[in-house]
């Protein structure tokens, strides 16, 4: 099993010498019969026979901190994948609601783009916005100066003028943009929290030095 054995293992390790079999090994061996029988008692006997009569690899160590680190890393990459899914959704929705917007920014979820979409989620709202305010919004988020901000502003206005004529103009559709932005921002907060805890755990004395050395060795690979 994936996780169901962990609490039992943690309990037994205190008093007994305990070993873990890879579930792929036990599953392969219990499926040798012609008829597939799902029975906990029979499965337990088959697993016990594997341990007694077969030479299979097993593990006898369980480090709580290493398990914690692996669990945090898995969550980090799962949330990263989920964030990518919603970034694709945002791109798809913008092609319908705000065509041409994706040509303004190379990354539509960068800080500047997110700030604009949160405040001006439709082409009309951008065209009606105060020029100085919009340029200042771009400048304060991009940190790249006035010349760059004015160039982005011109591209944004041009894309908005085109989008007014070709977009599917329904105010109710804009809620899809704001909802997706909120979800992406929430994912970014979760990722930052996980990364902070992962770094804290790696720098602590709770992780064995040899494990840290192995991680450093992997990082050294070009």
Residue locations for each model-derived region?
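A detector of single, family-specific signature residues
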Residues: 1-222
